[in-house]
Amino acid sequence: PLAGFFSKLFVFTACLQSSLYFLTFIGILLSGITAFYYIQIIKIIYFGRLNFWSIYIPIDKSNAVMISITTLLLILFFADNSIFITSNLVSLNIFHFLK
């Protein structure tokens, strides 16, 4: 649970050392907003009561498979290639660093 905290701390520290004060301010502001919403979700889970009943309609297995395949094809063929190129470069840099 503390990995996210320390990673944000290191990013904010690097921004401050690079004199990117506005970016640091925006990051801290957005972290505070997201923390508020996460705390609200936890509060509802542990202390809230449902005011309504939800009805969940199960999806057939064939429909679930079709939705999964369609989503996968859309991501693989219509997503921007820069995402895959960036992840490939990062993995190569990590491999080169460990070698």
Curated annotation (Swiss-Prot):
**Catalytic activity annotation:** a ubiquinone + NADH + 5 H(+)(in) = a ubiquinol + NAD(+) + 4 H(+)(out)
From the Swiss-Prot or TrEMBL record, state where the protein is found. Answer: Mitochondrion inner membrane
Report membrane topology.
Multi-pass membrane protein
Keywords, alphabetical: Electron transport, Membrane, Mitochondrion, Mitochondrion inner membrane, NAD, Respiratory chain, Translocase, Transmembrane, Transmembrane helix, Transport, Ubiquinone
- Looking at the record's lineage, which domain of life comes first? Eukaryota
Q: What is its main location?
A: mitochondrion
Please tell me whether the keyword Translocase is annotated for this protein. Answer: yes
Q: Which GO terms label this protein's molecular function in UniProt? A: NADH dehydrogenase (ubiquinone) activity
Q: Listed GO cellular component terms? A: mitochondrial inner membrane
EC assignment: 7.1.1.2
EC category name? translocase
Give the protein name, as stated in the record. Answer: NADH-ubiquinone oxidoreductase chain 2
Which organism does this record belong to? Cyanidium caldarium (Red alga)
Give me the gene this protein comes from: ND2
